[in-house]
Curated annotation (Swiss-Prot):
N-palmitoyl cysteine lipid modification positions: 20
Localization in the cell: Cell outer membrane
Protein name: 17 kDa surface antigen
GO cellular component, one term: cell outer membrane
UniProt membrane topology term: Lipid-anchor
InterPro entries linked to this entry: Anti_2, Gly_zipper_2TM_dom, Surface_antigen_Rickettsia
Amino acid sequence: MKLLSKIMIIALAASMLQACNGPGGMNKQGTGTLLGGAGGALLGSQFGQGKGQLVGVGVGALLGAVLGGQIGAGMDEQDRRLAELTSQRALETAPSGSNVEWRNPDNGNYGYVTPNKTYRNSTGQYCREYTQTVVIGGKQQKAYGNACLQPDGQ
């Protein structure tokens, strides 16, 4: 399945779960946990085969949920949008080891993405390791990940 299709399914599932949460919807921490878990599962599914891939999905989902919940507790929609756009730009165009920053002038939250090693995985996809750092309310948190291009360039 293409990465874009997976992302759309995750977004749809997240919005449906928010609707089930009652008046006011899910809070930022709940949304962060849900999206972090889904994103972690998606990243974990890129590694291994058979049972190894299932382990990757499980570990990715767990780590993503924990980190997503912590980060989501303090990030608002504008923070998430800025972080997402910055991540995409950093992974596509920035040299390894450089920081690509974002800053929300409304609340002072900020962060940066540091793209690292570029490599080809076992299925021939081009992938890139990265570090994402966010500072929310003066508290810094880091996440590490890998992002891979799909055959269609997405």
